[in-house]
């Protein structure tokens, strides 16, 4: 059975290019699927809300519902595009830091590749800031395909 392709997707034009590439990869491997992953970190001030007794727990649940409501149409459009190309697609909204979330999903699903888009930052910018493709390339046990930004 083919291994799923894990796609990091945030709705940007860069992730749209990554979606196109993931669809092509999937079509080149009959039977493979795409797991479209949207990662979102909870705001730092709400991290205590993981404890149900924390006063911020309700605020975190409200925040999560708002984010889900906002990103659902975007994720639906992306999944519909992949499915229209004949690729079975699953959508996941993961509440975690993107690099950790994408690696976890890829390992749990037995994926052979993580596909992400690049916003065109060079290696220095990637090394200085939190740049998901750069971090994945240097830390992931799962191979990573970085799709360049298309102007």
PLM features: residue spans?
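Glycine-rich, Arg-bearing micro-motifs that act as flexible, cationic patches
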Residues: 4, 113-139
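Small/aliphatic-rich secondary-structure junction motif
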Residues: 1-58
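Short, flexible loop segments at boundaries between secondary-structure elements
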Residues: 141-151
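Structural beta-alpha unit
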Residues: 1, 24, 77-114, 151
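A short acidic, glycine-rich active-site loop
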Residues: 56-73
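Short secondary-structure boundary segments
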Residues: 38, 117-119, 148-149
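General small-molecule cofactor/ligand-binding pocket signal
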Residues: 35-37, 90-94, 145
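Short, hinge-like loop/turn segments at secondary-structure boundaries
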Residues: 52-55, 108-110, 132-134
